[in-house]
Amino acid sequence: MIAKSIKAEIVKDNARSALDTGSPEVQVGLLTGRINELMPHFKTHAKDHHGRRGLLRMVSRRRKLLDYLKSKDASRYVALIAKLGLRK
């Protein structure tokens, strides 16, 4: 689980306005934070298949949000990909 302070920082960095918590940029940022936090767990616990299912679900949700953002506003998509260091 992401700590509250880290979560608030991710929201602040990706928000489009002061009270924005639901834009695709914020959602993708939070999912990326959760995914990055889980990666060390799967390096040491390779056979945690139930946990891996949750990870793959998060990755899929992030991909869908990125596809939505790309279809709505390609410039925001490109900026977010560059900021988070994700592949296209």
From Swiss-Prot:
Give the protein family: Belongs to the universal ribosomal protein uS15 family.
What the protein does?
One of the primary rRNA binding proteins, it binds directly to 16S rRNA where it helps nucleate assembly of the platform of the 30S subunit by binding and bridging several RNA helices of the 16S rRNA.
Q: What NCBIfam families does the database record attribute to this sequence?
A: S15_bact
GO BP annotations listed:
translation
Q: Name one GO cellular component term.
A: cytosolic small ribosomal subunit
Entry's Gene3D superfamilies? 6.10.250.3130, S15/NS1, RNA-binding
Q: What is this protein called?
A: Small ribosomal subunit protein uS15
What's the name of its gene?
Answer: rpsO
> GO molecular-function annotation terms?
rRNA binding; structural constituent of ribosome
InterPro entries assigned to the protein according to its UniProt record, in alphabetical order: Ribosomal_uS15, Ribosomal_uS15_bac-type, uS15_NS1_RNA-bd_sf
Q: How does it assemble?
A: Part of the 30S ribosomal subunit. Forms a bridge to the 50S subunit in the 70S ribosome, contacting the 23S rRNA.
Keywords from the named record: Ribonucleoprotein, Ribosomal protein, RNA-binding, rRNA-binding
